[in-house]
Amino acid sequence: MKKLSFQQIILALQNYWQDYGCAILQPYDAHVGAGTFHPATVLRCLGSKPWSVAYVQPSRRPGDSRYGMHPNRMQHYYQFQVILKPSPDNIQELYLKSLECLGIDLKKHDIRFVEDDWESPTLGAAGLGWEVWCNGMEVSQFTYMQQIGGIECRPVAGEITYGLERLALYIQGVDEVKELDWNGQIGEKALKYGEVDFEAERQFSKYNLELANSKMLLRHFKDSEEECKRLVDGDVPLAAYDECLKASHTFNQLNALGVISVTERASYILRVRHLAKICCMKWLELSGE
């Protein structure tokens, strides 16, 4: 199997899906917990207009902070997201061919689709789904997006999310993310993943778990919540959705700090879900659907 570097994996996926006909978008410039939170998925999966895109999305999950000491769990990581709307009949075949373009021989490796229906409580999103396992390691999530913001997706969109670090661990045959070959160079130009990202991993873990100001974050959440509602009323759902994302990330920070009780957690999830819903409803209203 050809051992692509981390950046070569990204380039190969971009080229593959570009050749299929996807527009290659850029990462969204906000703190999100997954590629699904990009407005190119949340808002564009709604409505009847066709939409085929692919993009890398840096993602943050404060609760996964491990100071860079865990072999494959980080508070900051990368996903590659593909949205095909309407979902083509051969989407599974397209996905498997994308693995082949990464040098994975499907005849020599055990590729399994393990049923795992997907749900995002904060987005009010859900769909039939499968985890994709390669020789026992999860490398992707495959979902038929049926609902976002509590609104049915018509037509249903196909979503493929590649876990880039896990995929790279398998392709390169290494055990720790920090040891991944980032750029495929040798000698002085060679870079490992750890040299690029792990000092930030250490510092942000300390911030997420030790230094974050919970009182300030509680104010930030309330401010983002109020601003989101105000902007929806002002007919700018894209700007409002940014505030929804801020509220969602702030909730994740508070959760990582352990300052939210079980009961409060459920309440916060409902509040963020409401923000996502009103953004989605306003987006559809302005789209004439």
From Swiss-Prot:
Gene3D superfamilies: Bira Bifunctional Protein, Domain 2, Class II aaRS and biotin synthetases, domain 2
Pfam families the UniProt entry points to: tRNA-synt_2e
InterPro entries documented for this protein: aa-tRNA-synth_II/BPL/LPL (IPR045864), Gly-tRNA-synth_heterodimer (IPR006194), Gly-tRNA_ligase_asu (IPR002310)
Protein biosynthesis listed as a keyword: yes
Annotated catalysed reactions: tRNA(Gly) + glycine + ATP = glycyl-tRNA(Gly) + AMP + diphosphate
Record-level GO cellular component terms: cytosol
HAMAP family: Gly_tRNA_synth_alpha (MF_00254)
Oligomer and partners: Tetramer of two alpha and two beta subunits.
Stated name of the protein: Glycine--tRNA ligase alpha subunit
Native species: Rickettsia felis (strain ATCC VR-1525 / URRWXCal2)
Gene from which this protein is expressed: glyQ
